[in-house]
Amino acid sequence: MAAAAAAAGGAALAVSTGLETATLQKLALRRKKVLGAEEMELYELAQAAGAAIDPDVFKILVDLLNLNVAPLAVFQMLKSMCAGQRLASDPQDSVPISLSTSTSETRGRNRGGPILGNVTISAERGSRERPIQRMPRQPSATRLPKVGGSGKSNSRSSP
């Protein structure tokens, strides 16, 4: 009889709604102490926003960001992991980094994780060591080409 009650309890648990599953998941997280109080709030916000992510993966992401790993590096690594490819093997799919705005930001954040930090460092060094090839400047469509040699306007007439 106890086996039948256990089977019925297991069937009832399998039929539980999404809300009950989420509640059970939260209770399991609190028991395991995977996430702290602030991290739990962030995790619940992420779930409310529709992000379905494993709590352990969420904890790793939060830890990386707490270690000042550049968020762009975390994003690129996640993107490459989801695509099933390494970041270095698919350069045309990676997000372009403008070094003028993010150099000071990434330098301070590269101390973080050894994996993600090295990805950012190698990408930054590679772009710095490449010879710069500048394109010739295109003439402006609104300006007329200079005709006179002096470059000064001769609009005044002498009496």
Swiss-Prot record:
Subcellular location(s) of the protein: Cytoplasm, Cytoskeleton, Microtubule organizing center, Centrosome; Cytoplasm, Cytoskeleton, Spindle
Keywords noted in UniProt: Cytoplasm, Cytoskeleton, Methylation, Phosphoprotein
Polar residues composition bias: residue spans: 91-105
Region (Disordered): 87-159
Main location: cytoplasm
Modified residues (Omega-N-methylarginine): 111
Modified residues (Phosphoserine): 153
A GO-annotated cellular component: spindle
Highest taxon in the source lineage: Eukaryota
Function statement: Required for the recruitment and the assembly of the gamma-tubulin ring complex (gTuRC) at the centrosome. The gTuRC regulates the minus-end nucleation of alpha-beta tubulin heterodimers that grow into microtubule protafilaments, a critical step in centrosome duplication and spindle formation.
Binding partners and assembly: Associates with the gamma-tubulin ring complex (gTuRC) consisting of TUBGCP2, TUBGCP3, TUBGCP4, TUBGCP5 and TUBGCP6 and gamma-tubulin TUBG1 or TUBG2; within the complex, interacts with TUBGCP2; the interaction plays a role in gTuRC activation.
Name of the protein in its database record: Mitotic-spindle organizing protein 2
Organism of origin: Mus musculus
Phylogenetic placement of the source organism: Eukaryota, Metazoa, Chordata, Craniata, Vertebrata
